[in-house]
From Swiss-Prot:
SUPFAM superfamilies per the UniProt record, alphabetical: Class I glutamine amidotransferase-like
Residue ranges constituting the Glutamine amidotransferase type-1 domain according to the UniProt record: 1-206
A biological-process GO annotation: L-histidine biosynthetic process
Protein's organism: Syntrophotalea carbinolica (strain DSM 2380 / NBRC 103641 / GraBd1)
Gene Ontology terms: cellular component: cytoplasm
GO molecular function: glutaminase activity; imidazoleglycerol-phosphate synthase activity; lyase activity
Subcellular locations according to the entry: Cytoplasm
Gene that encodes the chain: hisH
Protein name (record): Imidazole glycerol phosphate synthase subunit HisH
Length: 206
């Protein structure tokens, strides 16, 4: 059973529909007991880091998430769901994350330029990824694939070996992570057309 955590912040229906398009049913739930029973767990997210952590804590989701990861069952984080895996974020202050992957979440500088043009923050739209490691979710995909991003912050892992893909926007940043059973993307697979559907199918196939 694929379970998508509904903690009040995330584009849940589009993620669910993405799985359905590739032949997998996915259950959206706000019940921590259901989350605890998931075979595969998906943590989406949009909004502010602190608000999402507050919602996860208030909803009783933190412990089931940690237990799921520790059990070795597949886990997929999407966008803010990637950032929440990390130790801390500097978004609107200093806030603690789930600390599943050591590292921090930092903001794109406002003065980034490319070929003399000022780059806008948030980073929004299509961008190519460079696959660094053969994460299971990237099976059948190659570097140079375009995916859809919407974010002002990016993750900086303490251990660079967890970086599964990078992208460039004024600087090279981490676009996806992979460590054992934990995979997460800064971009939105559910908005990334055929490439994104392949990622969701690969996760469902695990």
């Amino acid at each position: 059973m694929i379970v998508i955590i509904d903690y009040g912040m995330g584009n849940l229906r589009s993620v669910q529909k993405g799985f359905e398009k590739v032949g997998y049913s996915a259950r959206v739930t706000d019940d921590p007991a259901v989350v605890a029973q998931a075979d595969k767990l998906v943590l989406p997210g949009v909004g502010a880091f602190r608000d999402c952590m507050d919602q996860l804590t208030a909803g009783g989701f933190v412990e089931p998430i940690l237990r799921h990861v520790e059990s070795g069952r597949p886990f997929l984080g999407i966008c803010l769901g990637l950032q929440l895996l990390f130790t801390e974020s500097e978004e609107f202050g200093h806030h603690q994350g789930l600390n599943i992957i050591p590292g921090r979440v930092v903001r794109f500088p406002g003065d980034m330029q490319e070929q003399g043009e000022v780059l806008k923050v948030p980073h929004m739209g299509w961008n190519q990824i460079d696959i660094q490691r053969p994460a299971p979710i990237f099976q059948g995909l190659d570097s140079g694939e375009s995916v859809y991003f919407v974010h002002s912050y990016y993750v900086v892992p303490e251990d660079a070996s967890v970086v599964a893909a990078t992208a460039d926007y004024g600087r090279t940043f981490c676009a996806a992570v992979w460590r054992d059973n934990v995979m997460a993307t800064q971009f939105h697979p559910e908005k990334s057309q055929q490439v994104g559907l392949r990622i969701l199918k690969n996760f469902g196939d695990m």
